[in-house]
Amino acid sequence: MNDNKILVVNAGSSSIKFQLFDYHKKVLAKALCERIFVDGFFKLEFNEQKVEEKVAFPDHHAAVTHFLNTLKKHKIIQELSDIILVGHRVVQGANYFKDSVIVDAEALAKIKEFIKLAPLHNKPEADVIEIFFKEVPSAKNVAVFDTTFHTTIPQENYLYAVPRSWEQKHLVRRYGFHGTSYKFINNYLEKHLNKQNLNLIVCHLGNGASVCAIKNGKSFNTSMGFTPLEGLIMGTRSGDLDPAIIGYVAEQENMSASDVVNALNKKSGMLALTGASDMRDVFAKPQENAVAIKMYVNRVADYIAKYLNQLEGNIDGLVFTGGIGENASDCVELFINAVKSLGFATDLKLFVKYGDSCVVSTPQSKYKIYRVRTNEELMIVEDSIRLTQK
């Protein structure tokens, strides 16, 4: 058992992230293959060593085989059969997958069926699963879905007020994303607080960002919708807007609807408002970007207030996680101050260096406020072990 390894894979349209764990859940190596289809770049970190090299990756298969060969070359693994589990992050499982799943032909067919809902994500994820079937045939492959945690959202929160045939024929409804992160946060705080069935409002804030209302330990509502475009203002995504804008701009600019949606996904958000998609760059110019920062903060505050109301004011905590939520103290302070009328209170002195979590609410705060470091890869490892030990 000591030689057994678990690999976590996150495949995107032009990149693949890898993390290799031992069976005690310790990280052995991290790697990134990026610029697939273009010129290719490979990064590997292991045992306090770093490898960076330009490598041509004509496709995802070439990237996977290069990664596996590099693991053997540096003796991180002896044989490919050392990898007994491969956990794949899959973005879209629709409402079909209520749990993570050991991937067989039927599960793979379903993942492919949902490519139409998330073409940029599910297609490379399905392709990479098939690559691992071929390259590491002895390993079991587990799919862990961003959407699974949100399959508990009640109908009144997942339906859109559109013709019902759109849902019945085309699966148009709220799905929500970042579910693996929300599951990790919920599980972590259950252990940390020694309490089950928590009510939480969790803000996962990174370049992609969302908020989730957790009721009795289950997702009750979330800001992302049919796609990750809905909800908060993000690095390059617009978040909520009037859908009539899509048709109007398509007509005025002689663009297709999909071109407009692409612009809303990749050329909007903070990038459109400030010229920068990274919040560190935005906050480096607070006066110049004051309006954009106010818009960004207000949108997060709106969702916190909305979900506090939906949870009837009964929460065990407000949680900030993700790259911004975990690290940008000035940003988190703004979010909390924007909802201080609801009883939330913080003090910058509480924003000290911390390990996995810290409390940033003052004794005067009506509700506890936490910062918790999420770990989606560890959640995927734990799900993979759980399923294969059944």
Swiss-Prot record:
Q: Name one GO cellular component term.
A: cytosol
Q: What is its EC number?
A: 2.7.2.1
Q: To which pathway does this protein belong?
A: Metabolic intermediate biosynthesis; acetyl-CoA biosynthesis; acetyl-CoA from acetate: step 1/2
Q: Name one GO biological process term.
A: acetyl-CoA biosynthetic process
Q: Which Pfam families does this chain map to? A: Acetate_kinase (PF00871)
Residue positions binding ATP? K17, H204, L205, G206, N207, G208, D278, M279, R280, G323, I324, G325, E326, N327
Residue(s) at site: Transition state stabilizer: H178, R237
Quote one Gene Ontology molecular function term: magnesium ion binding
* UniProt-annotated binding residues for substrate: R89
Quote the subcellular location field of this record. Cytoplasm
In terms of InterPro entries, this protein maps to:
Ac/propionate_kinase, Aliphatic_acid_kin_short-chain, Aliphatic_acid_kinase_CS, ATPase_NBD
Q: Which cofactor does it need?
A: Mg(2+); Mn(2+)
**PROSITE patterns, sorted:** ACETATE_KINASE_1, ACETATE_KINASE_2
Instruction: Give the annotated active site.
Output: D146 (proton donor/acceptor)
Binding of Mg(2+), residues:
N10, E376
Top-rank taxon: Bacteria
Cofactor: how bound: Mg(2+). Can also accept Mn(2+).
Subunit-structure text:
Homodimer.
The record's function comment reads: Catalyzes the formation of acetyl phosphate from acetate and ATP. Can also catalyze the reverse reaction.
The name under which this protein is listed is Acetate kinase
Q: Which organism does this record belong to?
A: Mycoplasma pneumoniae (strain ATCC 29342 / M129 / Subtype 1) (Mycoplasmoides pneumoniae)
Gene that this sequence comes from: ackA
